[in-house]
């Protein structure tokens, strides 16, 4: 509710901890309001007291009231009742715990079974301080072994010995009863106890069923100390409470009855269940009272037990589910809580909200990107509560009078006491009267801030802030560029809109979540939006070389460009008629000084090198220099979504707001051009010429013939299988290769045939729609259809469709589509095509569910990880995850890809380009000016400085090559130096041919100073220093190498001014790029990883023609990694070799054989069993010869061998391949079977390799007896054969089933070495890849590189190499998965995930087994999975949740400590009282004037110098405006009409005259950018618009009588009366006391140190504020302080403003507010007593003046200077209108200074926009001093006579 605090006056406490526990029977009775004892609900049509709908438990129907609290249906929350059970029963949720505790204590005396004082126990208690769950587990493990309650026997023996012995004392206490313990088993919902040993109880049976009653007795005997030892809590969770004796009856609100029309009420499931319990309970009581048989009672108790159990959980395994009469299972309490739709996830974590709208979206290219068009019907329905203040009462009164029926109206008035007046039902006129403090719920109007969202919300750019524009009709309209972050299209998508209900929310959305602020995504540091669709297509067409635009059309286009400055550029062609090129028009759209180099999509790489690399014949090199498109065709590479493109650069260089306008302007102008130009596509575009078709047919015919040939070869067995593949795989690969090749060849010939003007092609080339493949499929041939990565499989009887013959492997039968879409498919082709398409659809559907779950798990695992104020990254338990975010402490949004100039070049080039030689005079003279050369020659340490620079560069290069041994890493850093240097060259007009005046010594010292300022980790201790070094190492290396002396004097040629500007710019941009504390980087990382996962393919196929090994990729691999799976689909090692093995394939083969597991089966050709009784004379003819030779020297006793013979013939080829010898195999057989098998074998060189094996039997004598159970020899031999073939390992590692050997052809697997010359060289070593992993065994092999060899099984890496290695392995594996399909995710997100998974020192899986085993609070865990189990566990162990995380706070409806909620604000409430003085005499006087002191919400009262935002809250940029509407802007009076530009409030930037009854425009023009009294052109007496004779300003006009307290009139400025207490005679904007602006603000004076006239755009403290940039004017209304573009040089921040008074962070302590003190206290160092402005002799500063206190420079009416007749411009009066701080003696404003004439302190007469007469022009602006280089007096645009161009801001100009 937006109205908390209005409706409910009671203050709300913040929940700081949540204590879990079990409700004990006493407490249940205490909180109960009714004892429920009857199962009936009604009696005589009335709710029955003591029944299940007891009226004391809550309200029953709409009209009723609650008997307990007398509330009605909306107010009464419901109250618990209770019902007492006749017998105790088990609580099903606690059953497992009950069992555990039974096993820990003695069944008879309730003692712990272990000695509490035993060291083991004490250690456990110490170890598990707060973790009681762990404690129970460990104690339970100790007790499990005990079967006797110890202590009885020892007690008797020990006593006589030594009664004083402390041990005995302990024994006495610990002594148990010495009886044997039963073992317990759970059966269903019963517990059975069984005694194993013969118990000394004579009659007791050995096995009984424990009743809950008996267990309760045991539990009641446990002492409080023991309760603590078993991890429970005597106060909150006692063991006996786990047994139910009293049941709470939930309130009626929890189980409402459903009233169906025409029939009785349907009671809720819980009510039914409770009624069953009561009935059973009554029956049990009756039977007990009547003394029924024991078995009857037992049955009743079991039934009661069943009902109580199913009330809690209705899905108990082994129990029937309780059902309603109809057979529908009842919904138990557990089912109500768990799952997506349950209470936790469905109602607490996520709720349905009010003030939201949903409808279909439609495109509208004319809306700005941050605007959404809202239908009027929605605007009329959604309201915003606006607080009535004296400033907006008129406006709101008007809305209220219109009511709800007319559009800009209001729905409700909410009075201060919370009463609502509904304006729909014609209320009395008196009710409509508004008073300050009321709230008006007004309709949504233009300019409101809303949140727009499209599900699925995969990343933070799926919910962004927009502004509203009310449009007719019924759909949301949005700009096309914004569709990409939302992933929306206009084929019927719906989107949601939320209207925030408080100013704080609006401010937050506006300052953080608006679309322009999200242009760059931290996910991949690139823009998320680009130009799309028709605009993209047109921008390519328009920027081609041959596009010309004539004069009328040019005028038309300029009309569409809002930022046009009124100058038409020189046309490119003058005769015969003026023509402009398309490039010129595009240059007009580009804002400001941007420099970009890109290529067009068709750019050939060959053009980038060679002597003519600057010449681009196809106009494919896009060069934008100084905001001018010089060459190149603009396509999606320049204005799309790629990193480093034009849009990216504009956003980084000029700020998000200009970038946002740029998006909109491109669209309006280009679309206007396209409407005239036209773009269409038809069948004509798809038709190629005759020759092409012939070519295509021939290609396909040839391909089909090739396939037939391959099939022939396969039939004839001529096809050699490729290594690692079977014959069939090889065949398929070959065929696939042929067919894919055919498709590609036909496609490329089709594309070649299309002309330059083909519309298909123009869309593909510009990147707006389609790809090359689409073209070739439409024109040439659709190609091979695949299912599961293979050709269409045979369906039945060896055919794909009935139309083909059996075993047809031809292209047509297996799914090759040779027709194009244009020609149309044959029926069978169509069928195959549909098969391929269907698979795609299924894949997508399955993938969506998979990735959605992955995303949820990632978010849940990392949701509370955030950057803290100490710069570390921690989770909600404040456990450190990273020392610095992303290891460099920078925000992913501000970094860019940069290249390290020193990494790649070899030594010679490196020395040539980076080594400076100060002794080379010729070089110095050529590159440096005389002064510099002299300085170098005179300096004594110059040479050593330059030498130290060189050695530092060499060291940097060595480090770089160590960090990036491959030399090709993508280095991501802030501040793109190359571009900054380029900007500097443009701004300072650097001439690259002249020598420079920048001394090399200055360069070295400058760079060193700068690198000291780039602080990520502050602190002077050793650790901090090292951390700082690590975090900024790369940045420093980049700085030193790019800004080295040699580079500066030969390539960049910056002069010293430019160099200083550059250093300052780097520093401020680096500061800006530091990650903000409070940033929720965990959620960001989870989204950044989850979002690309949805784009991945689900199944990765074994691609055709690849013989290398197949690895799991895509979503399945991602799942394996984050689940930390123990068993992978394709476990694999990548083995790198060293020494000779790496180079020599034979040696590599040796290693391969050592690794690959080889069984006998793999080398066997065939086996056979023969009956061959005589060993010497064999029956097998071919063996005779070698057998007889073998037995010539008999060394065995042949009499015992069996007559059966196993003959194994081996495959010679495979033996050689595996490098095996016969001897090795014989050894293995001998090793396996010993002497039981008699083996003979042929020589290695024999024709056939044969083994002959016989069983060596025992002596004949023994054999007879055992004959019975012995199997026959031949059967036994068969078993041996099977065993030998499969299990006999010949060599290798059993886990590694196959090893592939290959020589890598891609660089990522090659070995990169650094040559002696210092260059990089990649060497293709042999590498082995395996199926199966055994890292430990492999690492111990010889000739293996143990450093690079790695496994893809992260569990194995953890076991073998430890946690740090596995962190790197996860990072590498994740990177492989993501980059496989060309995505890129910034390293910091991957690193964060790896750190979260490994921070604890073990692998934490991102599943319930990992996330829910952390020590976070129970509330967070139960919001993920296993809801009820976790809550039960928490109750048993009396856990406490500290409510620190995100989920817990959301569940409790509190602000989570994250983002803007992670800090507190200090507010001086006393000061706030003086914040807003509203003179009572003007409150109802037609217009309202507020003092300019500032409301409490204004920035002057905000925490002044929190280190991050140099002293301003993000919300209110204005000086003083009312909390609701921002009615007062710093200089622009009150605006009754909302949305005009100017002013400073973000909402209605109004600038109207305070009260002007007649003129609709008021005294100010509606768009004036907040200039007050004497501000230029607003109230100047001679200005034609506001002349004294103007009817509205006649002194006789009733509302302007000079003495009227409301609107007095001074002779010059009609609206200021001297007696009006709040209006000072000078305009508030330029008054000396106005904190927001003082003309002497040092930032603009030529003497100011920070504003050097030669360096217009840089002041040391300003991140990127350049006065020459058109939109950063002092008056630009929408600039927030945290915006990078605000800077101390903006007038609102003048250093004299109290916010910056150096002696006090916010304002000076002696000044209660800036109405009365303005922060200028005498102790403030800027105001010394000698300052001429405050001289005591000044006539206006009389200490005796009643209203002038020395600390408060107020204007008081009694001050002599301020009589209405006071001369307006009194040069001698330091307090005249002329200048509040002007005095003739002031050194800055000396009358002799040419720029300052006495009548004009601010504008010099030479400034082209200034005329020295007091009537100032509208265009004057404090920003331009005559010396400012960017502002030349001759510039025709800013002529004094041109009324509408204010140099400060073309958009918001005073007079338009």
Curated annotation (Swiss-Prot):
Zn(2+) 2 binds at residues 106, 109, 149, 177. GO terms for molecular function: DNA binding; DNA-directed RNA polymerase activity; metal ion binding. Residues 1593-1816 are annotated as: C-terminal domain (CTD). Mg(2+) 1 binds at residues 489, 491, 493. GO terms for cellular component: chromosome; euchromatin; mitochondrion; nuclear body; nucleus; RNA polymerase II, core complex. It is found in: Nucleus; Chromosome. Zn(2+) 1 binds at residues 66, 69, 76, 79. The keyword Transport does not apply. Residues 314-331 are annotated as: Rudder loop. Residues 1587-1856 have a biased composition (Low complexity). It catalyses: RNA(n) + a ribonucleoside 5'-triphosphate = RNA(n+1) + diphosphate. The tandem 7 residues repeats in the C-terminal domain (CTD) can be highly phosphorylated. The phosphorylation activates Pol II. Phosphorylation occurs mainly at residues 'Ser-2' and 'Ser-5' of the heptapeptide repeat and starts at the 3- to 4-cell embryonic stage. This phosphorylation also occurs in the early stages of oocyte development and is not detected in oocytes arrested at the meiotic diakinesis stage. In the somatic lineage, phosphorylation at 'Ser-2' is mediated by cdk-12 downstream of cdk-9 whereas in the germline lineage cdk-12 phosphorylates 'Ser-2' independently of cdk-9. Its EC number is 2.7.7.6. It holds the Pfam family RNA_pol_Rpb1_5. Residues 256-268 are annotated as: Lid loop. It is an enzyme of class 2 (transferase). Its main location: nucleus. Disruption phenotype: RNAi-mediated knockdown results in embryonic arrest at the 100-cell stage and prevents the embryonic transcription of several genes. Surviving embryos exhibit gastrulation defects with decreased expression of genes involved in gastrulation. The binding of ribonucleoside triphosphate to the RNA polymerase II transcribing complex probably involves a two-step mechanism. The initial binding seems to occur at the entry (E) site and involves a magnesium ion temporarily coordinated by three conserved aspartate residues of the two largest RNA Pol II subunits. The ribonucleoside triphosphate is transferred by a rotation to the nucleotide addition (A) site for pairing with the template DNA. The catalytic A site involves three conserved aspartate residues of the RNA Pol II largest subunit which permanently coordinate a second magnesium ion. The C-terminal domain (CTD) serves as a platform for assembly of factors that regulate transcription initiation, elongation, termination and mRNA processing. Belongs to the RNA polymerase beta' chain family. This is DNA-directed RNA polymerase II subunit RPB1. It comes from Caenorhabditis elegans.
């Amino acid at each position: 509710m937006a109205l908390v605090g209005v409706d409910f006056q009671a203050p709300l406490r913040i929940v700081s901890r949540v204590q879990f526990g079990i409700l004990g029977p006493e407490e249940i009775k205490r909180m109960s309001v009714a004892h429920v004892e009857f199962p009936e609900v009604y009696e005589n049509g009335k709710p029955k007291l003591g029944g299940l709908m007891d009226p004391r438990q809550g309200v029953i129907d709409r009209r009723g009231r609650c008997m307990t609290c007398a509330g009605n249906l909306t107010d009464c929350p419901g109250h618990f009742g209770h019902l007492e059970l006749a017998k105790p029963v088990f609580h099903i949720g606690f059953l497992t715990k009950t069992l555990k505790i039974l096993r820990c204590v003695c069944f008879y005396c309730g003692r712990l079974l272990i000695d509490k004082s035993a060291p083991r126990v004490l250690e456990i208690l110490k170890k598990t301080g707060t973790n009681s769950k762990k404690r129970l587990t460990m104690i339970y493990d100790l007790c499990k072994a005990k079967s006797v309650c110890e202590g009885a026997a020892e007690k008797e023996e020990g006593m006589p010995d030594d009664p004083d012995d402390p041990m005995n004392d302990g024994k006495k206490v610990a002594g148990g009863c010495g009886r044997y313990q039963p073992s317990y088993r759970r059966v269903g919902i019963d517990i059975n106890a069984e005694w194993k040993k013969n118990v000394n109880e004579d009659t007791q049976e050995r096995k009984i069923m424990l009743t809950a009653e008996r267990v309760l007795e045991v539990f009641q005997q446990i002492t409080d100390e023991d309760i603590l030892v078993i991890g429970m809590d005597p106060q909150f969770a006692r063991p006996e409470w786990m047994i139910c004796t009293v049941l709470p009856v939930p309130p009626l609100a929890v189980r409402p009855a459903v009233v169906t029309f025409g029939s009785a009420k349907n009671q809720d499931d819980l009510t039914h269940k409770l009624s069953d319990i009561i009935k059973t309970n009554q029956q049990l009581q009756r039977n007990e009272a009547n003394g029924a048989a024991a078995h009857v009672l037992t049955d009743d108790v079991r039934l009661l037990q069943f009902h109580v159990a199913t009330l809690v959980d209705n899905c108990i395994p082994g129990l029937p589910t309780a059902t309603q009469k109809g057979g529908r299972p009842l919904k138990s309490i557990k089912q109500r809580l768990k799952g997506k739709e349950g209470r936790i996830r469905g109602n607490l974590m996520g709720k349905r909200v009010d003030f939201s709208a949903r409808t279909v979206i439609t495109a509208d290219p004319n809306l700005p990107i941050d605007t959404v068009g809202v239908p009027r019907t929605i605007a009329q329905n959604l309201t915003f509560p606006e607080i009535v203040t004296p400033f907006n009462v008129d406006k709101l009164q008007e809305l209220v009078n219109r009511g709800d029926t007319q559009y800009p109206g209001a729905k409700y008035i909410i009075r201060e006491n919370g009463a609502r007046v509904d304006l729909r039902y014609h209320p009395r006129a008196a009710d409509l009267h508004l008073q300050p403090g009321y709230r008006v719920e007004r309709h949504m109007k233009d300019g409101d801030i809303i949140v727009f969202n499209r599900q699925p919300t995969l990343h933070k750019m799926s919910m962004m802030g927009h502004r509203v524009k009310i449009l007719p009709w019924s759909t949301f309209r949005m700009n096309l560029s914004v569709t990409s972050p939302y992933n929306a299209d206009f084929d019927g998508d719906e989107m949601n809109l939320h209207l925030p209900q408080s100013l704080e929310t609006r401010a937050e959305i506006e300052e953080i979540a608006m679309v322009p602020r999200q242009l760059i995504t931290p996910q991949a540091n690139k823009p998320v939006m680009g130009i799309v669709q028709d605009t993209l297509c047109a921008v390519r067409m328009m920027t081609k070389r041959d596009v010309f635009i004539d004069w009328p059309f040019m005028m038309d286009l300029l009309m569409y460009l809002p930022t046009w400055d009124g100058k038409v550029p020189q046309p490119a062609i003058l005769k015969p008629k003026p023509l402009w090129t398309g490039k010129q028009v595009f240059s007009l759209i580009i804002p400001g000084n941007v420099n970009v180099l890109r290529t067009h999509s068709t750019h050939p790489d060959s053009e980038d090198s060679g002597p003519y690399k600057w010449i681009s014949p196809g106009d494919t090199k896009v060069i934008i220099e100084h905001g001018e498109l010089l060459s190149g065709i603009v396509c999606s590479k320049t204005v799309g979504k790629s990193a480093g493109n034009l849009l990216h650069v504009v956003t980084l260089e000029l700020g998000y707001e200009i970038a946002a306008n740029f998006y909109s302007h491109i669209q309006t102008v280009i679309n206007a051009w396209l409407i005239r130009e036209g773009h269409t596509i038809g069948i004509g575009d798809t038709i190629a010429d005759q020759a092409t078709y012939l070519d295509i047919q021939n290609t396909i015919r040839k391909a089909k013939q090739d396939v037939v040939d391959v099939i022939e070869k396969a039939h004839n067995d001529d096809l050699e299988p490729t290594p690692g593949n079977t014959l069939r795989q090889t065949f398929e690969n070959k065929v696939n290769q042929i067919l894919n090749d055919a498709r590609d060849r036909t496609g490329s010939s089709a594309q070649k045939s299309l002309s330059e003007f083909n519309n298909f092609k123009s869309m593909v080339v510009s990147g707006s729609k389609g790809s090359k493949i689409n073209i070739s499929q439409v024109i040439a041939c659709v190609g091979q259809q695949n299912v599961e990565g293979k050709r269409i499989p045979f369906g039945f009887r060896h055919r794909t469709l009935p139309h083909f013959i059996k075993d047809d492997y031809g292209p047509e039968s297996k799914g090759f589509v040779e027709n194009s879409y244009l020609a149309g498919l044959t029926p069978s082709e169509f069928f195959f095509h549909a098969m391929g398409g269907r698979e795609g659809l299924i894949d997508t559907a399955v993938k969506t569910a998979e990735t959605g779950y992955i995303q949820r798990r990632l978010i849940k695992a990392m949701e509370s990880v955030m950057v803290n104020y100490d710069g570390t990254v921690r989770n909600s338990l404040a456990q450190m995850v990273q020392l610095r975010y992303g290891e460099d402490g920078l925000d992913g949004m501000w970094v860019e890809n940069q290249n390290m100039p020193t990494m790649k070049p070899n030594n010679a080039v490196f020395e040539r380009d980076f080594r400076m030689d100060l002794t080379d005079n010729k070089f110095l003279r050529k590159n440096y000016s005389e002064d510099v050369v002299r300085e170098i020659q005179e300096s004594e340490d110059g040479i050593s400085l330059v030498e130290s620079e060189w050695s530092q560069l060499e060291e940097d290069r060595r480090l770089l090559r160590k960090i990036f041994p491959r030399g090709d890493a993508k280095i991501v850093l802030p501040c793109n130096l190359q571009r900054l240097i380029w900007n500097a060259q443009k701004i300072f007009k650097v001439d690259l041919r002249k020598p420079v005046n920048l001394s090399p010594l200055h360069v070295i010292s400058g760079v060193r100073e700068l690198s000291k300022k780039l602080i990520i980790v502050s602190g002077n201790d050793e650790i901090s220093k090292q951390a700082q070094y690590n975090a900024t190492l790369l940045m420093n290396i980049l700085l030193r190498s790019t800004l080295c002396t040699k580079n500066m004097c030969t390539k960049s040629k910056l002069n010293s001014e430019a160099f200083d500007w550059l250093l300052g710019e780097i520093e401020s941009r680096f500061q800006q790029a530091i990650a903000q504390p409070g940033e929720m980087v965990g959620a960001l990382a989870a989204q950044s990883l989850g979002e690309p996962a949805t784009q991945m393919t689900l199944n990765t196929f074994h691609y055709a023609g690849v013989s290398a090994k197949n690895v799991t990729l895509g979503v399945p691999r991602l799942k394996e990694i984050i689940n930390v799976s123990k068993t992978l689909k394709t476990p694999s090692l990548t083995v790198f070799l060293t020494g000779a093995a790496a180079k020599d394939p034979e040696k590599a083969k040796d290693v391969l054989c050592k690794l690959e597991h080889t069984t006998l089966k793999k080398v066997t050709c065939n086996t056979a069993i023969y009956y061959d009784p005589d060993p010497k004379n064999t029956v097998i003819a071919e063996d005779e010869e070698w057998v007889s030779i073998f037995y010539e020297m008999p060394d065995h006793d042949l009499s015992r061998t069996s007559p059966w013979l196993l003959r194994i013939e081996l495959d010679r080829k495979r033996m050689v391949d595996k490098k095996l010898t016969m001897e090795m195999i014989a050894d293995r057989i001998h090793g396996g079977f010993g002497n039981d098998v008699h083996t003979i074998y042929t020589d290695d060189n024999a024709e056939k390799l044969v083994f002959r094996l016989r069983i060596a039997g025992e002596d004949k004598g023994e054999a007879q007896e055992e004959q019975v159970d012995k199997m026959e020899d031949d059967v036994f031999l068969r078993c041996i054969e099977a065993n030998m073939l499969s299990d006999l390992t010949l060599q290798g590692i059993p886990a590694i089933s196959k090893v592939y050997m290959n020589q890598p052809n891609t660089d990522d697997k090659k070995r990169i070495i650094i040559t002696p010359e210092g260059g990089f060289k990649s060497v293709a070593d042999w590498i082995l890849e395996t199926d199966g992993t055994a890292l430990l065994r492999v690492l111990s092999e010889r000739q293996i590189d143990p450093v690079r060899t790695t496994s893809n099984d992260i569990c194995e890496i953890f076991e073998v190499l430890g946690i740090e290695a596995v962190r790197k392995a996860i990072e590498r594996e994740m990177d492989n998965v993501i980059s496989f399909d060309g995505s890129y995710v910034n390293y910091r997100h991957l690193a964060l995930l790896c750190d979260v998974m490994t921070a604890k020192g073990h692998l934490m899986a991102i599943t319930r087994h990992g996330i829910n085993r952390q020590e976070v609070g129970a509330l967070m865990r139960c919001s993920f999975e296993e809801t009820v189990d976790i809550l039960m566990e928490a109750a048993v162990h009396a856990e406490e949740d500290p409510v620190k995380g995100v989920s817990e706070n959301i569940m409790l409806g509190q602000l989570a400590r994250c983002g803007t909620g992670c800090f507190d604000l200090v507010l001086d409430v006393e000061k706030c009282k003086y914040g807003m003085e509203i003179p009572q005499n003007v409150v109802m006087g037609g217009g309202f004037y507020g003092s300019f002191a500032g409301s409490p919400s204004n920035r002057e009262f905000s925490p002044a110098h929190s280190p991050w935002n140099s002293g301003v809250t993000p919300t209110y940029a204005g000086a003083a405006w009312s909390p609701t509407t921002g009615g007062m802007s710093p200089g622009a009076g009150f605006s009754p009409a909302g949305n005009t530009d100017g002013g400073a409030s973000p909402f209605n930037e109004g600038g109207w005259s305070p009260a002007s009854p007649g003129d609709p425009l008021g005294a100010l023009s509606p768009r004036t950018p907040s200039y007050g009294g004497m501000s230029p052109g607003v109230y100047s007496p001679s200005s034609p618009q506001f002349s004294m004779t103007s009817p509205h300003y006649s002194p006789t006009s009733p509302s302007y009588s000079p003495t009227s307290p409301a609107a007095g009139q001074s002779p010059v400025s009609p609206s200021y009366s001297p007696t009006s207490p709040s209006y000072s005679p000078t305009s508030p904007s330029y008054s000396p006391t106005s904190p927001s602006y003082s003309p002497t603000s040092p930032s603009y004076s030529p003497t100011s140190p920070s504003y050097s006239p030669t360096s217009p755009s840089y002041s040391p403290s300003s991140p990127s504020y350049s006065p020459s940039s058109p939109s950063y004017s002092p008056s630009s209304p929408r600039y927030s302080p945290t915006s990078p573009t605000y800077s101390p040089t903006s007038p609102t921040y003048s250093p004299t403003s109290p916010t910056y008074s150096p002696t006090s962070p916010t304002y000076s302590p002696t000044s209660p507010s800036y109405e009365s003190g303005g922060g200028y206290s005498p102790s403030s160092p800027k105001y010394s007593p000698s300052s001429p402005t405050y001289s005591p002799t000044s006539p206006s500063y009389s200490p005796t003046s009643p209203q002038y206190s020395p600390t408060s420079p107020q204007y008081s009416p009694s001050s002599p200077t301020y009589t209405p007749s006071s001369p307006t411009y009194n040069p001698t009066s330091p307090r005249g209108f002329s200048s509040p701080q002007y005095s003739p003696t002031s050194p800055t404003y000396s009358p002799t200074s040419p720029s300052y004439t006495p009548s004009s302190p601010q504008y010099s007469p030479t400034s082209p926009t200034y005329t020295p007469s007091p009537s100032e022009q509208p265009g004057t602006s404090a920003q331009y001093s005559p010396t400012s280089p960017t502002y030349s007096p001759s510039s025709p645009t800013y002529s004094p006579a041109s009324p509408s161009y204010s140099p400060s801001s073309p958009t918001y100009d005073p007079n338009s």
